[in-house]
Amino acid sequence: MDLLYRVKTLWAALRGNHYTWPAIDITLPGNRHFHLIGSIHMGSHDMAPLPTRLLKKLKNADALIVEADVSTSDTPFANLPACEALEERISEEQLQNLQHISQEMGISPSLFSTQPLWQIAMVLQATQAQKLGLRAEYGIDYQLLQAAKQQHKPVIELEGAENQIAMLLQLPDKGLALLDDTLTHWHTNARLLQQMMSWWLNAPPQNNDITLPNTFSQSLYDVLMHQRNLAWRDKLRAMPPGRYVVAVGALHLYGEGNLPQMLR
């Protein structure tokens, strides 16, 4: 990398975040500019509409880049194979925790009887977000996708829903670790979600090296965070010259081995 690029990178890091939303600007050699946004996939009513300045950035961009286009009507969990009875797949303690949280969320445990373990975890997480007042239509990436379509802006997927489902289907023990982490860190997850909401409603992190609670086991973190960050880094590095608004989950922007660090 040339000296000018290194100086620009250092200057950007020293300035910190000067936006009213969680974002980090990255410039790569070859005149490629990325505005990385820490998205929340479900948001509150107060998180709409998006900041005018952010919409202007999107208008001036060559494309919007997202993890997956969530604006389509496709159901990602359709046609999944049924699993054996839940009692045969998890421990008695895990089953009791699941039943307790299901009751707390107003969900019938019978809903989960033959679902994959990773799907149960995701349903629980989505229901928890709904209980906190969040809805998919107020999610940051969903709002950006709607704005991009109104502006006739190209949309590029880093993964796509099909690849995300394929990744989940390949989790060890059919996603047992994801369910166990969801049950174990249930209240921590709620606080983390509220913290990420505050980045949009109040003020974003001013220090890109903030420490976040670890709610993943190491093996799961490697699959869901580290390996995906590596793949996204390679895809972004392969982009042609231009300006891009990139929306990824907020946890991918901060903490150990985050996407901006990998790109620099």
Swiss-Prot record:
Under Pfam families, the record lists: TraB_PrgY_gumN
Protein name, as recorded: Uncharacterized protein YbaP
Give the superkingdom in one word.
Answer: Bacteria
What is the scientific name of the source organism? Escherichia coli (strain K12)
Tell me the name of the encoding gene: ybaP
User: InterPro entries this protein is in?
Assistant: TraB/PrgY/GumN_fam, YbaP-like
